Amino acid sequence: PIMFHAMAVAKPLMEKYGETHAIVGLLHDAYENPWNTEADFVGCGEIFGPEVEAAVRAVTKAEGEHYLEEYIPRCFANPIAKLVKVTDLENNYNGLHTIPNPDDRVRLTAKYGTALEMAGE
């Protein structure tokens, strides 16, 4: 379930960087739905503050945004979002062995590996 992934991303962030990073880790996939609106991001900021809102915006891939050419550089421009995304990528990368389709494993290995290289990891 998606909540377990969010918790797996948030836990090491909490241990290394604290509450702000952990909150963004918990929310890092929450806004990647077509039904989310600008008001949802504003609401996030009202609840958790502008630093969390900015990082959640940065870590949220926009519909139609090219992953490696647009999204990853934009995400990595925000220091909190970058740490969250790297933790997310590491979690995803470490779980690739559970994906049954070998073509999907190869594609995602390349995608996550390239993004981690872009982060300097």
Where do the PLM segments sit?
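Active-site helical microenvironments for divalent-metal-assisted chemistry
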Residues: P1-E121
